[in-house]
Curated annotation (Swiss-Prot):
GO terms for biological process: chloride transport; detection of light stimulus involved in visual perception; gamma-aminobutyric acid secretion, neurotransmission; glutamate secretion; monoatomic ion transmembrane transport; protein complex oligomerization; regulation of calcium ion transport; regulation of synaptic plasticity. The lineage of its organism: Eukaryota, Metazoa, Chordata, Craniata, Vertebrata. This is Bestrophin-1. The chain crosses the membrane at residues 32-51, 61-82, 238-255, 275-288. The gene is BEST1. Changing residue 41 to P: In VMD2 and ARB; no effect on subcellular location in transfected MDCK.2 cells; possible decrease in protein stability; reduced chloride conductance. Ca(2+) binds at residues 10, 293, 296, 301, 304.
């Protein structure tokens, strides 16, 4: 009963779809012609009464009614209601088709998994697939009127060969007030387990695959049963039907052509045939008829499912697959492309025009000049290199630049990122980082960099262990002058630092300091009074004993209570040097 026109629209040509309008079976004309004739007859009866049977006063009243109906007829949301309803019906129709039980996969598993070419094996395979077909027929006769007319009772199924008399008696013993379409699937599961226990199915994995496919078909049958039971809500169908028919009942009056002599707006013409009203009836009522036909595809309409053909096809194909085709294989031979790495199937003269080369991609044929194919240096790498030069000059490591890779030995000597610029800052690193980033555009960041360099202990400064940055030589090293206010020193354990500063001793002593007097300290704290002498520290590295390898880890592993001092505003580098000297002595 399905109307197939796929071959007629295989090629989009002039008139290919227009020829479909001439079909009668399954067409909209076949569904609509009766109601359209009724609408046409009612329209011309009302027109005849208006023109010939009414008096002038009655005509005036009818004309007012016509204008009123025509002005308010558009308030009915017929397109909105019909659109949602037909979409719901078409979706439901396609889901029912997808749940039609096809035993093709199950018959392949039964033919391959259930072994034995003897009579017992053959009987086992045919019985299993017959149970599957019986379950399909039981559910189809429950939802399809065409299948029910073919098998109106269980006795007809026995006579048709879907069920044996013994199975019919077994089915009648189950006196339940429910549909019995699930019983053959239970028989199938039990018989499959018996076949596995009897050695007909070798592995439990094969049994599981067989039962999974059986459950898939059983689920599809359950879905068909649910679709037949749970329909689209009746109120929705009623609303759509009332909206469509009330719209065209109003059109019978509102779309009448009035007397042009009375000069009503929109009624300048007096046509006998309301063409667009008839077209509107054809479209909207035809739209409703589509939903009425698809709402139950298991009926006897022209476009309903061919359920009886499905029953015949499934039984014939499945029995052939599990019986005659079981282990009936053709002899294996080398194919005609046995030693050809690139097989080329031939084309006929009619299909030679469809031969195409392989598609390699839309950019495969793009050509570039030689200059355009050269790689360009990365701009970010150049900026990072420039920033690295400035950072090396200032003795800092960039926070946005990733350090080079370090091996297992140099990784321990790499200065910590947080100890360089954030030592002595609050523990809220996020606020500290935002403060540093906000002051990068100001000159103050240079002063902070110098202060951070001086505040860090010597062994944690960049270049202390790196020969390219700070060459180890016996030449004196100097520190930049303090650009800001003098630092206030706090007490350090074991040392009295009140009103005193440091002074280096260059005669005799190595790596030692002495305290300056208060006047010398005042000159150093106020460089604008007099020119301050540059302070130098001399290290004698020639007579130092050889340091073991693990000695480099000691400054990083020392407790902060032994080597760190607490300063305000800025840390004095001389105290850091002295602490380092005392810690290593």
């Amino acid at each position: 009963m399905t109307i197939t026109y796929t071959s007629q629209v295989a090629n989009a040509r002039l008139g290919s779809f227009s020829r479909l309008l001439l079909c009668w079976r399954g067409s909209i004309y076949k569904l609509l012609y009766g109601e359209f004739l009724i609408f046409l007859l009612c329209y011309y009866i009302i027109r005849f009464i208006y023109r010939l049977a009414l008096t002038e006063e009655q005509q005036l009243m009818f004309e007012k009614l016509t204008l009123y109906c025509d002005s308010y007829i558009q308030l009915i949301p017929i397109s909105f209601v019909l659109g949602f309803y037909v979409t719901l019906v078409v979706t439901r129709w396609w889901n029912q088709y997808e749940n039609l039980p096809w035993p093709d996969r199950l018959m392949s598993l039964v033919s391959g998994f259930v072994e034995g070419k003897d009579e017992q094996g053959r009987l086992l395979r045919r019985t299993l697939i017959r149970y599957a077909n019986l379950g399909n027929v039981l559910i189809l006769r429950s939802v399809s009127t065409a299948v029910y007319k073919r098998f109106p009772s269980a006795q007809h199924l026995v006579q048709a060969g879907f069920m044996t008399p013994a199975e019919h008696k077994q089915l009648e013993k189950l006196s339940l007030p429910h549909n019995m379409f699930w019983v053959p699937w239970v028989w199938f599961a039990n018989l499959s387990m018996k076949a596995w226990l009897g050695g007909r199915i070798r592995d439990p994995i094969l049994l599981q695959s067989l039962l999974n496919e059986m459950n898939t078909l059983r689920t599809q049958c359950g879905h068909l049963y649910a679709y037949d039971w749970i329909s689209i809500p009746l109120v929705y169908t009623q609303v759509v039907t009332v909206a469509v028919y009330s719209f065209f009942l109003t059109c019978l009056v509102g779309r009448q052509f009035l007397n042009p002599a009375k000069a009503y707006p929109g009624h300048e013409l007096d046509l006998v045939v309301p063409v667009f009203t008839f077209l509107q009836f054809f479209f909207y009522v035809g739209w409703l008829k589509v939903a009425e036909q698809l709402i139950n595809p298991f009926g006897e309409d022209d476009d309903d499912f061919e359920t009886n053909w499905i029953v015949d096809r499934n039984l014939q194909v499945s029995l052939l697959a599990v019986d005659e085709m079981h282990q009936d294989l053709p002899r294996m031979e080398p194919d005609m492309y046995w030693n050809k790495p690139e097989p080329q199937p031939p084309y006929t003269a009619a299909s030679a025009q469809f031969r195409r080369a392989s598609f390699m991609g839309s950019t495969f044929n793009i050509s570039l000049n030689k200059e355009e194919m050269e790689f360009q240096p990365n701009q970010e790498d150049e900026e990072d290199a420039h920033a690295g030069i400035i950072g090396r000059f200032l003795g800092l490591q960039s926070h946005d630049h990733h350090p080079p890779r370090a091996n297992s030995r140099t990784k321990l000597l790499w200065p910590k990122r947080e100890s360089l610029l954030h030592e002595g800052l609050p523990k809220n690193h996020k606020a500290a980082k935002q403060n540093v980033r906000g002051q990068e555009d100001n000159k103050a960041w240079k002063l902070k960099a110098v202060d951070a360099f001086k505040s860090a202990p010597l062994y944690q400064r960049p270049g202390y262990y790196s020969a390219p940055q700070t060459p180890l030589s016996p030449t004196p090293m100097f520190f930049p002058l303090e650009p800001s206010a003098p630092s206030k020193l706090h007490s350090v354990t074991g040392i009295d630092t009140k009103d005193k500063s440091l002074k280096t001793v260059s005669s005799g002593a190595k790596k030692s300091f002495e305290l300056l007097s208060e006047s010398d300290g005042a000159l150093m704290e106020h460089p604008e009074v007099s020119q301050v002498r540059r302070k130098t520290v001399e290290f004698n590295l020639t007579d130092m004993p050889e340091i073991p390898e693990n000695h480099l880890k000691e400054p990083l592993e020392q407790s902060p209570t032994n080597i760190h001092t607490t300063l305000k505003d800025h840390m004095d580098p001389y105290w850091a040097l002295e602490n380092r000297d005392e810690a290593h002595s």
